[in-house]
C-alpha cells in the first residue's frame, strides 16, 4: 500500500518537476503548466496539470493552438512515479524515505534542465546544499561532519577537474554548475560515498561520450552536458551506496 501511495506522490512530483523545468531556466516564477508554444502560452486548468490529464483532454493537444505536448512531460511523470513507488522497498526508515525522495526529485530536475538547457542552476543547487547539511543532523548513516567533508571534497575535486579541463580543452569543457552539483552531492552523500559517486559519474559520462563519438552522433568539439551523469550517479549512491561501498572494499 505504501508503494502505491508513493507512486501517486511521485506522479504529482513529476508534474511539479515539469513545471519547474519549464520555468526556472527562463528565470520565471514557477506557474501552472502551460503550452510549450511561446506564442500561445495557454495555461492548463487543474485537470490538465498532469500529462495523463492532458492526454484525456483532446489527446493532449493544447486547446488554444493545437500544439502537441512535450514528450518529456509524460516520461518524467511516469518515471518519477515508478521510482518513488520502489523507494519503500529500498528504504525502511521513514525520515530517510522522505528526505531521499526529496533529494531524488531535485536530482531528476537537475538532469532535465541540464539535458535541455545545458544549465545547472544555483537556485536549485545552493539552497539544496544547505538543506542537505541540515538533514544530515537527523538522517541515520550520515552526520554533519561527514556531510560537510563530502561537500568540501566534491567542491575541491571538481574545481580541480574544472581547471584541468579548461586548460586542456578550453573554456566550457565543464561548467561551473557541475562544481556546485558536486558540492551538493557531497552534502547529500557524505564521505566516502561522494568519491565513489564522482568516479561513477565521470566513468559513465566518459563511456557514453565515447559511444556517441564512435557512432558519429556528436563531434569532438561538441558540448556534452555532464551534470546528468553526476546526478544519476548520486541517485544510485543514495539507494545502493552502502552496498556498493562494501563491495568495493571487500
Task: Identify the function of each model-found stretch.
Residues 18-23, 59-67, 107-119, 160-172, ...:
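C-terminal ends of transmembrane helices
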Residues 76-83, 124-131, 181, 226-231:
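Core segments of transmembrane alpha-helices
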Residues 73-80, 94-103, 214-226:
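Hydrophobic alpha-helical transmembrane segments and immediately flanking/interface helices
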Residues 1-91, 246:
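N-terminal transmembrane signal-anchor/hairpin module of polytopic inner-membrane proteins
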Residues 1-12, 88, 133-140, 233-250:
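Hydrophobic alpha-helical transmembrane segments
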Residues 6, 97-206, 247-250:
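Functional transmembrane core segments of multi-pass inner-membrane proteins
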Residues 176-177, 210-236:
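Interfacial loop-to-transmembrane junctions
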Residues 11, 15-19, 85, 155-163, ...:
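Transmembrane alpha-helical segments of multi-pass membrane transport proteins and ion-pumping complexes
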Amino acid at each position: 500500500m505504501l508503494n502505491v501511495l508513493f507512486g501517486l506522490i511521485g506522479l504529482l512530483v513529476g508534474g511539479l518537476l515539469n513545471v519547474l523545468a519549464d520555468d526556472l531556466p527562463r528565470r520565471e516564477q514557477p506557474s501552472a503548466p502551460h503550452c510549450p508554444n511561446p506564442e500561445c502560452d495557454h495555461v492548463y486548468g487543474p485537470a490538465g496539470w498532469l500529462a495523463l490529464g492532458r492526454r484525456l483532454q483532446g489527446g493532449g493537444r493544447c486547446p488554444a493552438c493545437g500544439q502537441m505536448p512535450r514528450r518529456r512531460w509524460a516520461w518524467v511523470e511516469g518515471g518519477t512515479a515508478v521510482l518513488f513507488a520502489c523507494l519503500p522497498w529500498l528504504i525502511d526508515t521513514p525520515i530517510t524515505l522522505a528526505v531521499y525522495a526529496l533529494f531524488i526529485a531535485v536530482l531528476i530536475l537537475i538532469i532535465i534542465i541540464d539535458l535541455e538547457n545545458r544549465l545547472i542552476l544555483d537556485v536549485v543547487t545552493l539552497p539544496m546544499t544547505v538543506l542537505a547539511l541540515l538533514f544530515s543532523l537527523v538522517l541515520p548513516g550520515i552526520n554533519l561532519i561527514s556531510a560537510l567533508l563530502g561537500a568540501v571534497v566534491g567542491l575541491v575535486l571538481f574545481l580541480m577537474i574544472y581547471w584541468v579541463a579548461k586548460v586542456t580543452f578550453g573554456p566550457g569543457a565543464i561548467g561551473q554548475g557541475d562544481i556546485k552539483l558536486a558540492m551538493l552531492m557531497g552534502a547529500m552523500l557524505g564521505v566516502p560515498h561522494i568519491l565513489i559517486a564522482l568516479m561513477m559519474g565521470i566513468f559513465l559520462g566518459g563511456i557514453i561520450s565515447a559511444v556517441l563519438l564512435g557512432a558519429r552522433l556528436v563531434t569532438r568539439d561538441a558540448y556534452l552536458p555532464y551534470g546528468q551523469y553526476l546526478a544519476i550517479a548520486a541517485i544510485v549512491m543514495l539507494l545502493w551506496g552502502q552496498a556498493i561501498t562494501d563491495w568495493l572494499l571487500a
